[in-house]
């Protein structure tokens, strides 16, 4: 019985390895190769050790399923967050090697609840909920997301792992654990990377036809899938999806 349970855990990914077995230091540096460019305000901030420490605080992140599923989640996470923090074309490697250039939205300063960190955490409610989840008072100290790299990554992974309202978690979508409801099907929200864009910024980017923001998110994702040697899957855009606020 014990051996049977262990075998089942192995198959389902619940007995998964450390995220660092997929994202090595060399891979991290290859994916985010221009993050420490002199033109990047975030130079020196986003470190491999901070990412691993944060990732290991969230069971299931990058450890769910087989190696293909795990790599696909890592590619999707860094694809979305690289768009949120992009510095554009910083080298001959092109625009999809320019992620993690910024920490603060518009390089702002001060204590407001503007976008910070890899996911550009925004709004007092998100700062409050994220802070409760990771054990930090981010309402009274929101700039901790821009000054402590581990906290910064933790807020991004918290957002990634957490369902809110009628939105599934990004994690459940990319790992195949989300089943669209009738309302989702009616809104053309099908499993794939495009729904994750809808979760993150659907009100601005989705259901409006082809646009450069969604193209940029897909471009980052495709680059990381290539580096990780994994297929990106179907339904990459949200051009024809209604956003979740429209139900």
Curated annotation (Swiss-Prot):
InterPro entries: Glyco_hydro_19, Glyco_hydro_19_cat, Lysozyme-like_dom_sf. It catalyses: Random endo-hydrolysis of N-acetyl-beta-D-glucosaminide (1->4)-beta-linkages in chitin and chitodextrins. Keywords: Carbohydrate metabolism, Chitin degradation, Disulfide bond, Glycosidase, Hydrolase, Pathogenesis-related protein, Plant defense, Polysaccharide degradation, Secreted, Signal. Its EC number is 3.2.1.14. It is found in: Secreted, Extracellular space. GO terms for cellular component: extracellular region. It holds the Pfam family Glyco_hydro_19. The keyword Hydrolase applies. One of its GO terms (biological process) is polysaccharide catabolic process. Gene3D superfamilies: 1.10.530.10, Endochitinase, domain 2. Its main location: secreted. CDD domains: chitinase_GH19 (cd00325). Disulfide bonds join 206-238. It is an enzyme of class 3 (hydrolase). GO terms for molecular function: chitinase activity; endochitinase activity. Induction: By fungal infection. Residues 1-16 form the signal peptide. The active site is at 84 (proton donor). It comes from the Eukaryota. Belongs to the glycosyl hydrolase 19 family. Chitinase class II subfamily. Defense against chitin-containing fungal pathogens. This is Acidic 27 kDa endochitinase.
């Amino acid at each position: 019985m014990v051996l049977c349970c262990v075998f089942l855990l192995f198959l389902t990914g619940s007995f998964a390895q450390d995220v660092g077995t997929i994202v090595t230091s060399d891979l991290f540096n290859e994916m985010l190769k221009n993050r420490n460019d002199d033109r990047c305000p975030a130079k020196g901030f986003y470190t491999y050790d901070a990412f691993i420490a944060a990732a290991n605080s969230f069971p299931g992140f990058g450890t769910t399923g087989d190696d293909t599923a795990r790599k696909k989640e890592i590619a999707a996470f860094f694809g979305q967050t690289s768009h949120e923090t992009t510095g554009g074309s910083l080298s001959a490697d092109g625009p999809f090697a320019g992620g993690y250039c910024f920490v603060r939205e518009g390089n702002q300063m001060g204590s407001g609840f503007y976008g910070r960190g890899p996911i550009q955490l925004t709004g007092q409610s998100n700062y409050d909920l994220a802070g409760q989840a990771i054990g930090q008072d981010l309402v009274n100290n929101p700039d901790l997301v821009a000054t402590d790299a581990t906290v910064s990554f933790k807020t991004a992974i918290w957002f990634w792992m957490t369902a809110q309202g009628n939105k599934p978690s990004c994690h459940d979508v990319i790992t195949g654990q989300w089943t669209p409801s009738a309302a989702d099907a009616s809104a053309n929200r099908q499993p794939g990377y495009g729904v994750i864009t809808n979760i993150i910024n659907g009100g601005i980017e989705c259901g409006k036809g082809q646009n450069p923001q969604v193209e940029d998110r897909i471009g980052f994702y495709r680059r990381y899938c290539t580096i990780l040697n994994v297929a990106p899957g179907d339904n990459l855009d949200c051009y024809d999806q209604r956003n979740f606020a429209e139900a």
